[in-house]
Regions:
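Surface-exposed coil loops of outer-membrane beta-barrel proteins
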Residues: 187-218, 226-331, 335, 449-459
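Outer membrane beta-barrel transmembrane domains
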Residues: 337, 350-374, 378-385, 395-397, ...
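Repeated loop/turn-to-beta-strand initiation elements of outer-membrane beta-barrel proteins
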Residues: 164-172, 226-227, 303-310, 342-349, ...
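Residue-level signature of outer-membrane beta-barrel architecture
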Residues: 122, 160-164, 221-223, 244, ...
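Membrane-embedded beta-strands of outer-membrane beta-barrel proteins
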Residues: 156, 217, 294-296, 334-336, ...
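Outer-membrane beta-barrel pore domains and translocons
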Residues: 134-138, 177-179, 243-247, 299, ...
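Outer-membrane beta-barrel "beta-signal"
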Residues: 502-514
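N-terminal periplasmic/intermembrane-space "pro-region" immediately following the signal or transit peptide
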Residues: 20-147, 161-168, 232-233
Length: 514
């Protein structure tokens, strides 16, 4: 190519010289100028070609010169990979290993930590826990000894996750309780206990000490009916509980008068007075209100807004209530309940029958006059709570019993809980209740003759008529987890004593829950 460019340039110069030997015409002059420009462009192209050839030679020689550098880089990369593999094979982290290995190990450890945390979360998922603290201070008039008392009680509950076995759902429930203070009942002879929230572990434990009690621990299984049917369409259920339980958690419930930590404090307005009272509680539980047993319940929700149910249970009584002996002469109870609506307002109605083969009495055991004589008792009760208006719930309890040594054999309680929305305090409530407990004929005839081992009269009066009880409380909600409740009670003719002065009990309750 370079030779052809030189020949073209020579011919161009020759043509220019020939044209210059004679006088040039204008066309020849223009042609000569054009040829000159072409010659200059050819010269520049030649120089550019020479430069490109030089660069091409340089690039052609470069791989041969850098081959050694590439081999060195490959060896360095192989060495780095070997160090990285060795570092990853060791679980430890060293400052001498490649940074990439350290970072990979750090990511791996963080991932393992996250997995461990997820495992812990999975292991506790489904657990439910609750805690509450209740403290009550009361002052009573017309009592012979100290009329001012203070007590506290703390409750912790835990429910395990639901375990499904086919269509059957089961879980465990645990309840721990601790407290101090026995309340005014220890200084007052009455069919009604002014403070159901009082609790202290054992009479032998000094009052300055406190101990934790496993109050409840039981198993629950819910079985949809019919057994083996299609669960999503089931409207019937069978529930089985067994273990250590509070019988009142399953029987004699009431929406307006059931919780001594938030509602009424006096025992006739918390439970049926014949089953729970300071003198001779027929419920058959231990000294703290709990006993081992088994319960079977049937619930029918074919009419969703008005379900009904039947339940039956057997609990330990006497020494069997505290596991000192087996289920000899236990406490039996059966209950029928239904939910009804009147004018769109919900009401719950219950009827129950019970029998205690070894219930405590007001009589003394001839073998030990300091101990109560145990005798079979039987009875029944009615219970209702009915909404009235938007924020009022009425309640009522009626009880009757028969058997030897009953201090009273009839019990009646009526009252209402009024929601604070009527005075723009939706979280508050006002409770009002009245009750009467009729002394039994046996108690009226023999109460004055009952003495203890030292010959001291246990009651010291001849009973007659009925004990009458009234209570008013106001529950003031400070915030969602804290409530303060001033409380007033009036007891007339306590334990049927016609000579007893009216007992006025003023108190205040603090309630914390979580």
């Amino acid at each position: 190519m370079r030779t052809s460019l030189i020949a073209a340039g020579a011919l161009l110069a020759l043509a220019i010289n020939v044209a210059g030997a004679r006088a040039a015409t204008p066309e020849e002059t223009s042609l000569r100028d054009e040829l000159r420009r072409l010659a200059e462009r050819l010269e520049r192209v030649e120089k550019r070609n020479a430069a490109l050839e030089a660069q091409l030679k340089t690039y052609a020689d470069r791989p041969a010169r850098s081959q050694g550098e590439i081999e060195a880089r490959i060896k360095a990369l192989e060495s780095y990979n070997k160090r990285l593999e060795d570092a990853l094979a060791d679980e430890g982290i060293s400052e001498r290993e490649p940074e990439l290995a350290s970072r990979l190990k750090a990511v791996e450890y963080n991932t393992l930590d996250i997995k461990k945390q997820a495992t812990v979360i999975d292991s506790i998922e489904g657990f439910a826990a609750g805690a509450s603290f209740t403290s009550v201070g009361q002052r009573a008039t017309s009592v012979d000894t100290n009329g001012t008392t203070l007590n506290y009680r703390a409750d912790i509950t835990v429910t395990t996750p639901t375990v499904k076995t086919g269509d059957i759902e089961s879980k465990l429930f645990g309840h721990f309780r601790v407290g101090q203070g026995r309340g005014i009942s220890q200084n007052l002879t009455s069919f009604a206990g002014p403070n159901v929230s009082s609790f202290q572990l054992g009479t032998a434990i000094p009052a300055e000490n406190s101990a934790l009690l496993l109050a409840q621990a039981y198993y629950r299984a819910d079985i949809p009916l019919p057994f083996g049917g299609f669960k999503p369409q089931s409207r019937e259920k069978l529930t089985i509980n067994f273990g250590k339980m509070d019988p009142f958690a399953f029987f004699d419930q009431n929406a307006a008068a059931n919780d001594e930590t938030r509602q009424f404090l006096a025992s006739p307005f918390v439970h049926n007075a014949l089953l729970d009272n300071p003198l001779a509680a027929n419920v058959g539980a231990d000294g703290f209100g709990f006993s081992p047993g088994v319960r079977v319940a049937y619930r029918n929700e074919r009419t969703k807004s008005e379900p009904w149910g039947l339940s039956f249970a057997m609990f330990g009584a006497g020494r069997g209530a505290n596991f000192s002996e087996g289920f000899r002469s236990p406490f039996w109870i059966g209950q029928a309940e239904t939910t009804q609506r009147f004018g769109g307002l919900t009401g719950n109605y219950r009827a129950f029958l019970w029998r205690n083969g070894q219930a405590p009495t007001f009589l003394r055991d001839p073998a030990n006059l300091d101990e109560a004589l145990l005798r079979p008792h039987r009875g029944g009760g009615l219970n209702f709570d009915q909404r009235f208006g938007d924020y009022i719930t009425y309640f009522g309890r009626l009880g009757w019993a028969s058997g030897e040594g009953l201090p009273f054999d009839r019990a009646l309680a009526l009252g209402a809980e009024i929601g604070g929305s009527y005075w723009s305090r939706g979280g508050d409530a006002l409770g009002i209740a009245f009750g009467a407990n009729r002394s039994s004929e046996a108690f009226r005839n023999t109460s004055a003759q009952v003495v203890d081992a030292a010959g001291t009269p246990v009651f010291g009066f001849a009973a007659r008529g009925s004990e009458r009880v009234a209570e008013v409380y106001y529950r003031f909600r400070v915030h969602q987890n804290f409530e303060i409740s001033p409380d007033f009670q009036l007891i007339r003719e306590a334990a049927g004593n016609p000579a007893a002065r009216p007992v006025k009990v003023i108190g205040i309750r603090l309630q914390l829950n979580q």
